[in-house]
Amino acid sequence: MNKAIVLVVIAVVAAVGISSFALTSINSDEVTPLVQELAVLEEEISILGTTNPFSAPTTIAQSMQAAQPAPNVTIGDDGKIYVLYQDTVNEETNIFLKTSTDNGKSFSTPVRVNLLDGNVALDGRVAPTIQLGDNGEVYVTWANSRYEPNMFMGNYRQLVFTQSFDDGKSFEPSIIIGAEELASGKYFQHMSIDGYGGIHMAWLDGPAKMNATGYMEKDESRDRGVRYVQSLDGGVTFDTTKLIDANACPCCNVQTAADGEGNVYISWRKVFGSGDTQVRDMVVAASTDGGKTFSGPVKINDDGFQFKGCVHVGAPMAIDSEGTLHVAWYTGATDHQGMYYATSTDNGQSFSEPMPILTGDWVPPQRIFIAIDNDDTVWLTWEDATGLSTNEKAWRYGDTQALIFTAQVIDGELIRADNPINESDAKSLTNIDSDNGLVSIVWTETDNSVKIAIAEN
């Protein structure tokens, strides 16, 4: 691909309070030793500034009734843009898909993805995931929710999957992932597709059981943690789910990545130790056999983030044409808190020295996302809530405002735009994607609109 246009999709929605502390105590587990040094300070690396290349955003969709806090985007090999967004009317949340074939200048009429009305959990922390097949297939997964008074925060979530065989013009009836297995709540899910059309999902799993009153409650006899499942027939059937790790932060995002060489990666925030001194650092587990088996967790960096709670942010990943794994993440470690970027050239067995993206004495927990274009240029986008956070110095992703910045990594240098691309305070950045000369970014802001902006590179 010749990188010609950078496309930004901005889903601008009313800010909603979505986070709360989830204090837990989890025993430590073994982890593969780390081989790199701690991150260097920001001023010690080359950071080149550039002007913001993005045009003013234009509106794709508008909601006046309720927030739609978790949009998502993907781009086809032909440059067609697919934008998912949620809309809530009369307390019923549904997912809609719009597409564009002219680089975002115009979009199709919306198609509702979920056939069962209101079968969607409204959660700005976790966007519905969309992936594309090679023959007009569109795959979407999300979580639904029902009231269960004995479960954490009173809700029980299931993982829902659907597919379209006509390029998103219509969708099939959805299925529940793991419906034939023992009951468990599924949270902070993510889905990837590999080069052969294999579908890979991972999530945080909370085993549950029915009690004598007819309500669900935690099942303490089974391990909670990160679980994984795959489908090798385009979502017609899914394998039995498998436990990847039992010592995961119970409310930080899980991320996946897969390529056409049999490599599948899962990242999550793992808990080491217990009590007030426990550490919650980002790790990656790797499979080189298409998801049949996975390595033990490897720390991306030995951050040593001591925190007995959840920051609600994960470590998104992308794989370039040479098979290098690229990852970005947030840490609240006292001596180097902020957002970082690193790579692995040995299938996740070790990681490079982290490159600081945003650091400071206080960096609120915010999201960072990553994509790689067809020229293997790395694109990063992140929220910067410095001075805007309503969380003060609480390590959690919560109800705050943020500015959205972008950068590229070229030949080891960070080329960062000097100005944010959003016109208003953003809320809940959810994805970045690239293909066919386009790079698309989606996030939420404060006026309930879905917008798009384009910049030529």
Tell where the protein language model's regions lie, with residue ranges.
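Positively charged n-region of N-terminal signal peptides that target proteins for export
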Residues: 1-4
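Extracellular, repeat-based ectodomains that mediate carbohydrate processing or recognition
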Residues: 7, 13-457
